[in-house]
Amino acid sequence: MVPKEAARTLDALSDESAAAIGRVLPRLCRAVIEATGVEEYNVLENNGGGAHQAVAHVHFHIIPKPNRSEGLGIGWPMHPLDPANAASVAERIQAALK
């Protein structure tokens, strides 16, 4: 799915375009399920080259996951979350939203 508004990353989209994505993406996911018969899927959206964005505009991939070996595979190492650091980051995010 590609939004009508041209933007390189998700954070650069207007609130209106983001709201439109929120309305359309679930409908598109339902269509993918119906078309493929696969009920499990990943929605992927990358922002920036370091995050594996290969095309320089916001777009979403809906990737059916028919079984453990097909579809998107995610293999990043899990690390315990430091509660103090998490609280600090949450506070900074909350402040940035104001």
Where are these regions (language model features)?
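HIT superfamily nucleotide-processing domains
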Residues: 1-98
